[in-house]
Amino acid sequence: METLFDMHCHLGFAPSPGVTAKDGAAAGIGAFSCTVEPAEYERLQLILASAPNVALGLGAHPWWIADGRVGETELARFCELARTTRFIGEIGLDFAGPRDTEESRALQTSAFACILAACNESAAPLAPTNPEGATATSGQNRTCIATTSPEANPPGEGTLTRSATDTAPKLISIHAVNAAAAALDALEQASTFALHRVIFHWFSGTSDDLHRAVKLGCLFSVGPRMLASRRGREYARQIPLGQLLLETDMPARAGDNLPAEVWRAELNNALSGIAQLKGIDRAELAEHIASTSRELLIR
């Protein structure tokens, strides 16, 4: 069974996150599970401590920042915890609907800058990468794809790194709704691209934003909901192979179950959809995406 990696999910929303993670491992699923606030992260640290197939992200979701559930105290705790992990997510900006006000934009932007600064403490510059090389769909010039086969380190073998060394680059999952350009500006201003690896979850910015993000070396996690829109499908087609990842963003809300067969089916649907859009073999795509995911998660 091929290993599939869900690079943006929310196991903390499941009624029994530990059981969901264990069932996912048995189904050949590895995961980057994001959180929405530091308290959730700390709770899940204990619950998922024995889940070798899950990397847990420290998060401060922009919705929670905008409505005050993540305030100054929670942000201070985020900054403390950021020194102890290299997995960050979900963080970002959301300027849609009720959050599209001058006050909310200012609050979110200030918090995002604080979060990015905290991520940079003790970080060392990344080795240069070549995003342009990632555009190849053959085996050449894909600098960000590991050579390990998808079956070499299955999720259940304890291979995902959980904590950071003083200089470890972080893996950061970004939420940006009506705010892709602003998020890219903030990430550039914080030198995030020189220090860390950035994943845009369910990218929904403009075409210019996408091209800018690709050139900056961003990765993009793509799931069935992104592929449900014409723009999402076109973006998935355009994203270079070496910068593509899978996601489900599931469970969608607190209390929802995520059976392993549903979880794997969602990832398979995304994989098949992307393969069709790009006109490449599904198995080849699966190998490339699994290798990229493993390189990001395993240190």
Language-model features and meaning:
Residues 1-299:
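Mid-domain alpha/beta scaffold segments of enzyme catalytic cores
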